[in-house]
Structure formats: structure tokens, C-alpha cells
Amino acid sequence: MTIMRKTHPLMKMVNHAFIDLPAPSNISGWWNFGSLLGLCLIIQIASGLFLAMHYTPDTMTAFSSVTHICRDVNYGWLIRHMHANGASLFFICLYLHIGRGMYYGSYSYMETWNIGIILLFLTMATAFMGYVLPWGQMSFWGATVITNLLSAIPYIGTDLVEWIWGGFSVDKATLNRFFAFHFILPFIIAAMAMVHLLFLHETGSNNPLGIPSDCDKIPFHPYYTTKDFLGIVLLLAFFFTLVLFFPDLLGDPDNYSPANPLNTPPHIKPEWYFLFAYAILRSIPNKLGGVIALVLSILVLALLPHIQTAKQRSLMFRPISQFLFWLLVSDVFVLTWIGGQPVEPPFIIIGQIASLLYFTIILAFMPIAGLIENKMLKW
């Protein structure tokens, strides 16, 4: 078998990626989230495939087909709740993975980082379209509000929105195409994840110290396969606790009402994992300005390699930058809370301050802190 895995064309690829891969000896549990995201993607594709066998993308029957899955299909309730909560789990792992990349300076690997940002956009698009499919109240109104944002684009906006809708409102054509895109995008995400991994293995992994680790590498198997397996066990324990005991904890009760174009819910909001970006969108009174801020809230990550001023890569020995990083994390939590609140005082001003702080920390405070720390270390 040793000879086989090193010589067979297919086995050789797996061997170089997961078995004989030289890995830094000191990477911590924060490096587990890449493999956990792979597991989340497998769970989502598998559960989604079984749901697609019973789901009908039609405005008249979509809601009842989801009800049918939960009531009549063998273990349909389990598959449905695994898929819905799997999305939440996916985003928890995704945000932790990005946070680790920011903390330890992994954004220095620019190709890997930029493909990661593309993966984030693709995952957000997939999750948004998936939320529309059950055709509940929040599905319908969420789709209407979010797609309508594109009308803020000058000149082509209105035509673009109607083109995406396939008519003059969110209707059967919209649902049909959203289902088609929701089905194909995870496979594109899987392909992009392989490219992400390819570029990562060109440079090798970063480590908590942020220093070159060429002099001290260990084989990926058995050390990190065992470590990843522990992460997988803990993740699945958390996941099935959520699915079996609290399946509706992260959902919206409004989505248990069938979509009604004549009745607007009192408060339209997306799923919890988009609330921070939604709060940034709402904090700007101008429609186009809000859309630009929404896109920039994610795209600002692409600027990180270009605005790095510190001579040290990791934040491990940089106390000022550490403080700012955790301030940013707290700010994202505040934005997530604000995104779920109605648009009224004092939430409006809190949202505006938190949005301003979000961009200021990343674009101004972090680079300035890097320069100060260089001076402190006499670099």
C-alpha cells in the first residue's frame, strides 16, 4: 500500500494532500476549521440531494412539499433540520476560520486568501437562495428585499432586478431559477475549495508564531488526521444536539407561515449569519450607499494583505493589535444583534456607530497599531 499511494496517479494526489503532507509541528486547534468546513459541505450536499428528491420548486406546492418532507418522508424531518442547521454550522466554522486567518496573518498567502473570499461570497449566495426555497413569509420577503437592492445600481438596476426575478415580482420563475442555482453552487464551492487547498499546499500552512516552519515539519498523517478527527467528533456532537433538541433555535417563526405577497411581516430580516452585514446595509440612509457598504463589509478582507504595516505576521506578540482584533469581534457581535432589531432609536445610532467602528478598526486602527508596535520593538 505504501508503494501504491506514492505511485498511483490518483492516490498520489491524496497522499500529497492528506498523508505525507509536511505540516508545521505547532499548529493549534484553530487550524481544524478547514477540514470541518469540508465536513459541513459534505453534510450539506448529501442532505440537500435527498431534500431535492422530494422538493418541488413551484410557488403553489413548494411550502407543502417541505411540509410533506417533514411529515411523510422517512426521516425527512431529520434531513430537513440537518440541512437547515448545517448552514448555521457552516457559517460558524467559516467565520472562525476567517477570524483565525486574520489573527495569525494567514492573509499573507494572497492567492489562498482571495480564493477564500470568493468562497465566502459563493457560500453567502448559496445560503441566501436556499433560504428562499421553503417559500415561507420570510423566504418571500427576504428574496424581495435583498434582490431589490440591485435596483440601486445606476442605469441598469431596475432591468437587472426584473431579469433576475424573471418578471415584475418574485414569483414562480424566481423560485425555479433559485432552486437551480442553489443546487449547482455547492459543487462549484467544492471545486473552488480544491483550488483553495492547491494554493495553500504551494506555500505550506502558516503557524501561530507566524514564522517560517520549514526546519520543523511533521507528516500530516497520523498527527493532524487524529487532531482533525477529534474536531469532527466535537463538531458532530454539537451539531446533533442542535438538530435533535433545538432544531428551530436559529430559524425564524415567520417562515412557518406560507408566503403571502399581500401581507408584509412587521420586521424583515435574513438568517442570523447575515445580520452583521444587514446592519451595515441599514446604517446608511442612502440605498446605493448601503449596498456599497454591504459589499465592502466582506470585500474589505481583500485589502488586509495590502494594509499590513507590522513587521510581525501573527498577533501573538502584538498586544495593541490583539486588543483591536477582539474589539472588532465584539463589534461584529453588536452588529449581529442590531441587525435583528427593528429600525428605531436607539438601535439606529448604535448600528451606525458599530458600522463606522467596523471599517475604522480594519482600515485605520490596525495599520496604525502595526506601526506603533514596530516602534516599540525598535524595528
Swiss-Prot record:
Note: Heme 1 (or BL or b562) is low-potential and absorbs at about 562 nm, and heme 2 (or BH or b566) is high-potential and absorbs at about 566 nm.
Protein name: Cytochrome b
Single GO cellular component term: respiratory chain complex III
A Pfam family: Cytochrom_B_C
Disulfide bridge partners, by residue number: none
Keyword check for Transmembrane: yes
Cofactor(s) the protein needs: heme b
Subunit record text: The cytochrome bc1 complex contains 11 subunits: 3 respiratory subunits (MT-CYB, CYC1 and UQCRFS1), 2 core proteins (UQCRC1 and UQCRC2) and 6 low-molecular weight proteins (UQCRH/QCR6, UQCRB/QCR7, UQCRQ/QCR8, UQCR10/QCR9, UQCR11/QCR10 and a cleavage product of UQCRFS1). This cytochrome bc1 complex then forms a dimer.
Protein purpose: Component of the ubiquinol-cytochrome c reductase complex (complex III or cytochrome b-c1 complex) that is part of the mitochondrial respiratory chain. The b-c1 complex mediates electron transfer from ubiquinol to cytochrome c. Contributes to the generation of a proton gradient across the mitochondrial membrane that is then used for ATP synthesis.
Subcellular location: Mitochondrion inner membrane
Broad class of the protein's primary localization: mitochondrion
Note on how the cofactor is bound: Binds 2 heme b groups non-covalently.
PANTHER family with a match to the protein in the record: CYTOCHROME B
Record flagged with keyword Electron transport: yes
Positions annotated to bind a ubiquinone: H201
Positions annotated to bind heme b b566: H97, H196
